[in-house]
Design a protein with these regions (language model features):
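Short, conserved secondary-structure segments in the cores of folded domains
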Residues: 66, 81-84
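Long beta-strand-rich cores associated with HINT superfamily self-processing modules
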Residues: 71-78, 97-102, 106-221
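Structural motif
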Residues: 86-93
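A short acidic-Thr-Gly-centered motif at the start of a beta-strand
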Residues: 76, 84-86
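Sequence-level preference for short, compositionally simple segments enriched
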Residues: 2-53, 77, 187-262
């Protein structure tokens, strides 16, 4: 080997470090980015005025479910008769099972895209066929969001909650005939309604839960997610705006166990 005074025979420490870092540097992990979407909201101010806004917020279940209960075309019972959900406005008197007609405080909606509709958990809607829960319940086919809750009356609810009723997720009633999941062929708007309390609204003859965050939501989400959720409710300073959860919710498993006599 020919010796050259300008080139070291043994690599220096810095050369080893540079070569090793180049050879063994772990690839950078891509940052996880949460998809966002526009949510359309309208609400009633303390002065009784109607306001509208579009809020860009994360496309995550806790946010989406706040604005997704029923699809466009659902007929909501009001003091003046059935009104399509897309034609409702804050301040209108909506018929509730517990309180009779009360002012609608908030409407949230977003457009479910075709791509989302092809995602089984988040996108699929549930078609509830006419008379699925009895005569005119519903009066006509109804499209509900995956996290919609239907008022479920059964004596076995009393052993769980002390009363014979609870809200049950629509997917608990899926049977492939009267209630089944569908994937819309085109984008479709979904809506939810909110009051200053938990309420049972009458939609096309069946009873649905209005928006309510639930008793444990605040403990289950971080401050950032809580802030994102509250941006959808300009009239509320906190999740306690919606009052206590007076009617409990059952899980899909619990509903099926009750119906099967377990």
């Amino acid at each position: 080997m020919t010796y050259s005074p300008n080139i070291p025979v043994h690599p220096t420490h810095s050369q080893i470090g540079n070569s090793q870092s180049a050879a063994y540097r772990a690839p950078a992990r891509p940052r996880t980015r949460t998809m966002a979407r526009p949510y359309n909201i309208s609400w009633l101010t303390p002065d009784g005025e109607e306001r509208f806004d579009t809020v860009v917020a994360p496309a995550l279940p806790v946010i989406e479910s706040a604005c997704a209960n029923m699809a466009r075309g659902a007929l909501v019972a009001t003091a003046t008769g059935p009104v399509a959900v897309e034609d409702l406005a804050p301040g209108m008197l909506v018929i509730t099972s517990e309180y009779g007609p009360i002012p609608l405080q908030w409407i949230g909606s977003y457009e479910m895209s075709l791509r989302e509709a092809q995602t089984a958990d988040r996108g699929a809607l549930f078609r509830v066929t006419s008379d699925a829960f009895g005569l005119a319940k519903p009066a006509h086919d109804l499209l509900l969001a995956p996290r919609s809750h239907i008022l479920f009356r059964h004596a076995k609810c009393r052993s769980l909650f002390g009363v014979d009723l609870a809200f049950a997720p629509v997917r608990a009633f899926e049977d492939g005939m009267a209630v089944f999941s569908v994937q819309p062929a085109s984008p479709i708007a979904v809506f939810n309604l909110g009051f200053d309390r938990q309420a049972t609204i009458k939609v096309s003859g069946i009873e649905l839960e209005s928006f309510h965050p639930g008793p444990h939501t605040e403990a289950l989400i971080d401050d950032e997610m809580k802030y994102a959720l509250l941006r959808l409710f300009p009239q509320a300073r906190g999740l306690d705006f919606f009052g206590p959860q007076l009617i409990n919710r059952l899980t899909t498993f619990e509903v099926r166990a009750i119906r099967e006599g377990a």
